[in-house]
């Protein structure tokens, strides 16, 4: 038991080191400019979102709207425009989409480049559902020098009623630090699939919070 506690403590310290470095880079990259200031609104509560933007139709609708941030789910799957498995915009259990991640982010990037006023540009929230998609997507994001606000999200720990989390927290943070150091981190727990299951399992434990 003591050996297990020492191992968990070492993993926690290693994770905390990586996380603190990411946090420092994020703060430096933001240059004291909040998302509200970027979009020229009074507070973050005034930010308008397009959620589950996982199809070409949904993306076109979001780009023509007055939303500030476009959120989409990302996993490895099949896209009609590509002959092999690629990162696509889809929410599990779906593994097929008409919109790849590259087309998703390029469409937003190109639209932003045609706009001078940052208040009219679009930021993105990348909601990763598959750890295999993280590295290739963040590398591509860096390669095009995407310069609007980016939130990076994933459930990287087993949480309330959840199990079998496929993300490795340290690897996720390392990828963000390397390829999207100025992004805003939005991480969480993989929880149970139903409300009844969540109630049955009770609240989060202190061990989960301290991780």
Regions found by a protein language model. Give the residues of each.
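Phosphate-group recognition and catalysis centered on beta-loop-alpha active-site segments
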Residues: 1-211
């Amino acid at each position: 038991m003591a050996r297990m506690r020492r191992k968990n403590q070492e993993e926690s310290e290693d994770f905390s080191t990586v996380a603190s470095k990411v946090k420092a880079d994020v703060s430096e990259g933001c240059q004291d400019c909040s998302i509200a200031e970027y979009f020229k609104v009074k507070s973050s509560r005034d930010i308008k979102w397009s959620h589950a933007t996982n199809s070409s139709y949904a993306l076109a609708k979001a780009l023509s709207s007055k939303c500030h941030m476009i959120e989409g789910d990302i996993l490895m799957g099949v896209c009609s425009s590509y002959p092999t498995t690629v990162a696509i915009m889809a929410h599990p259990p779906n593994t097929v989409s008409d919109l790849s991640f590259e087309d998703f982010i390029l469409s937003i990037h190109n639209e932003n480049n045609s706009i001078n006023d940052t208040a009219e540009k679009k930021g993105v929230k990348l909601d990763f559902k598959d750890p295999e998609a993280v590295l290739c997507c963040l590398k591509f994001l860096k390669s095009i020098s995407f310069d609007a606000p980016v939130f990076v999200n994933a459930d990287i720990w087993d949480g309330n009623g959840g199990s079998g989390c496929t993300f490795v927290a340290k690897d996720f943070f390392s990828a963000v630090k390397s390829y999207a150091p100025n992004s805003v981190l939005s991480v969480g727990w993989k929880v149970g699939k139903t409300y009844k299951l969540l109630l049955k399992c009770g609240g989060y434990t202190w061990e989960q919070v301290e991780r």
